[in-house]
Amino acid sequence: PQLEASHHDSVCTAVPKYEANVAAIKLLRQLEQEGRSATAQEHAVLSLYTGWGSLVKALDGATTDTAWQARHAELKELLTPEEFSSAIASSLNAYYTPLAVVQAIWSALQRLGFEGGNILEPSCGTGLFLAGMPQEVARKSRITAVELDDVSARMTKAMYAQYGVKVHQSHFERVRLPAGSYDLVVGNPPFGAEQSAELRNVPFAKFSIHNYFFAKALEMVRPGGLVAFITSSGTMDAYTAGHRAYLNSVAKLVTAIRLPGGTFSGIAGTSVTTDLLIFQKREAKAAASYEPKWAELVRVPTSSRICGSSSTALMTNEYFLVHPENVIGKLQSASTQYGGQTVVCKFDGDLAQALQERVAAMPEGIYKARAKSPAAESQKAEVVQLDQWRR
């Protein structure tokens, strides 16, 4: 069965989310003990696992809430020390993607001309981008997935290895993958100010983690290939622009869509402001001009259609003033938990419909499949048949 956009509606609050996570972990233990993959019914249980980003009380032994103390004790007993440490680490910057957003991203990629190929999903969580992949794309694709969190990676294997997906439990920075060999890198990398675990002396080694993922992904795709990520608004709106200059030198920004602040509130329990960014790798590295413009930050005039505030101090990437139709909602100023100010995007409409309207306005057919080679023909037996699972 293919997962519907409403699949996670039952786990939008803390207690059901915790219970679904525990049920998924227990099922994973059973599958591993029995040495088998998940059935379609079991897949539905595993795919309700949404990580621990909004469930810090379950990880916090110092909580004074007696109900969460009991859940914390249950979780400590259920997980090994290594798994528990991995859960804590992943809770800091891992936000699972709503399926409605995943489906819109695949629609966008199809409109751009992507029909299948060699696909990489770094930081895959439990494979929600695989769950939302159209079967006509899956039928023509080979897929590699990378996930740092041990439990999430094992769940992805339990669900998708039977269909040929190759899953690596590793840092994206450390996993050995062939550069320049992928047609598409897609996903929702971690957000955060911390640097990557990159050991090589590359220009992007010290980028913040979400910007690093873009740079590494562009290293992985072939010229003409696509990178489509959900990312923190910091990629577009950070005052420091070194990462934007680097990304622009190796790829063209195809589109940027500012998502509403509540996009991740249900499945991930966070109101972080995010963007959908799609890049196409240039045929050769060049100090290209910013076309479209997206290098600098500018003040948002109160007269702008994207301004939802009387403040004259709102700043955003110049791209969104040139393309206000790509902002889903209106920008406003909000206080951070540390007493500072940030820009949020407020929207009260139908997000799925708004995304499809933006997708319909994207350019058509800019992606061209690579010419088939004898080596590619010999790999047909390895093509991922996710459509079998969907029947």
Annotate each PLM feature:
Residues 3-159, 163:
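Class I S-adenosyl-L-methionine
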Residues 266-374:
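Flexible, glycine-/basic-rich loop-and-beta segments that form/coincide
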Residues 102-112, 116-134, 145, 149, ...:
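Conserved proline-anchored active-site loop of SAM-dependent methyltransferases
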Residues 162-172:
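Conserved SAM-binding strand-loop segment of SAM-dependent methyltransferases
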Residues 148-150, 205-265, 272, 276-278:
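Conserved Class I SAM-dependent methyltransferase catalytic core
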Residues 144, 166-168, 257:
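General small-molecule cofactor/ligand-binding pocket signal
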